[in-house]
């Protein structure tokens, strides 16, 4: 049985407001969950927030046979991690085995130790949308670290888009949507060209090479 020590709704809404989450925007995050053996798993997922003045929910979608989908159906608790863009790319490349975890504040599912902010949640509803399961999630705790701002480079944006597009190629192929898979492949290549142009011989270029080797 999971131990739940929740913040009150008003505090949660305030903290999520302070982090800058807005309704109607999909944010790229890393969701951590637990499998049936209690082993943590991390995966990149888009989260769509729905906020009112006194409540907040967010929705994520996963393939039912994906690790995250299976885990949340089995144990309906998880952590939404806000991270450095590089960590998002590593998660999209399935380099999660190298991730370090830290104890969460209210649930047994751990957060990422490198998360700059995190939202611990419970799943309150599931519904089927085409080939995906939509999980409606209710935050139970919100935490964050004090972080220093970083200068912006187009390489970060392009790298994230390339990783997201590339990671979806195989699922679309498996569903027989070859044209869509080809479209994603071409998009990923264009974004990687931006990385190579604005950040050659950098850690971003190294990650771009890993995306090429794994997906393209």
Predicted regions and their residues:
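Basic, polyanion-binding surface patches
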Residues: 1-118, 122-216
């Amino acid at each position: 049985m999971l131990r739940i020590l929740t913040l009150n709704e008003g505090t949660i809404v305030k903290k999520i407001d302070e982090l800058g989450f807005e309704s109607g925007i999909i944010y790229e995050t890393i969701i951590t969950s637990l499998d049936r053996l209690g082993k943590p798993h991390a995966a990149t997922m888009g989260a769509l927030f729905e906020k009112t003045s006194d409540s907040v929910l967010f929705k994520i979608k996963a393939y039912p046979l994906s690790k995250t989908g299976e885990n949340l159906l089995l144990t309906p608790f998880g952590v939404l991690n806000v991270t450095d863009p590089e960590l998002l790319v590593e998660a999209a490349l399935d380099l999660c085995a190298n991730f370090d975890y830290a104890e969460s504040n209210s649930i047994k599912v751990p957060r990422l130790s490198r998360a700059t902010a995190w939202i611990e949640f419970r799943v309150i509803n599931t519904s089927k949308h085409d080939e995906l399961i939509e999980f409606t999630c209710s935050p139970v705790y919100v935490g964050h670290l004090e972080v220093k701002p970083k200068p912006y480079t187009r390489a970060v944006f392009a790298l994230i888009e390339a990783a997201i597009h590339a990671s979806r190629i195989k699922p679309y192929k498996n569903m027989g949507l070859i044209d869509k898979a080809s479209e994603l492949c071409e998009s990923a290549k264009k974004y990687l060209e931006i990385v190579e142009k604005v950040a050659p011989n950098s850690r971003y270029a190294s990650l771009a090479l890993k995306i090429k080797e794994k997906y393209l």
